Amino acid sequence: MSPRSQAKSAQIRQETQKRIAAAAFSLIAQHGFEVTSVEDIAKAAGVSKGLIYTYYKSKEHLLQELVIEALRDGEQVLPSIMDSPDPSVVLNNIIRWFFKQLRERPEEWRLMTEVTLRLDRYPFMHDIVSAKMTGYVNVMQGLLLKLGYEDPLGEARLLAALLDGVGIQAVVIREGYPLDEVEQAMLAKYQGDAGNHK
């Protein structure tokens, strides 16, 4: 096979894998992991069921790859939202980024919500999700420490729980959820003088 043919073949494989991942992502976000079958994914992607197993060992492996990709997307923006020496600006940026993601990527949040709420059913995901959550809490703890919070770890855990709760409610209630008002309330809660946090 010529280098040109190899490049074309690699491009086709990559496009096919992206199509499979996009179809799986959409179906699992809409209907849930357990209800969505490999046949459903194959049909939505316009490929054979057997072809899916060329790229993924199992449906669980496919879910794992989807979650890793979703988490990777979030990590790519972290340097830009943390690009300030002022911890209050960074915390503000994190909160704004979170709400922006809820508005712009609702399917991703539905998928992540299902996975995080059912980690007991997806033990293969537990370590990945737990490690990421610990990392996010550690980042927020560092910011809250600089802002003068008396218990920065406790407050970071509270903030993570608030964000999780908002995410779940937004996914469940959808259009009726007052995202703008909740965002403003959360921004107001975490702005102000360090002395007020003790």
Language model region names:
Residues 65, 79-104, 146, 152, ...:
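Hydrophobic alpha-helical connector segments
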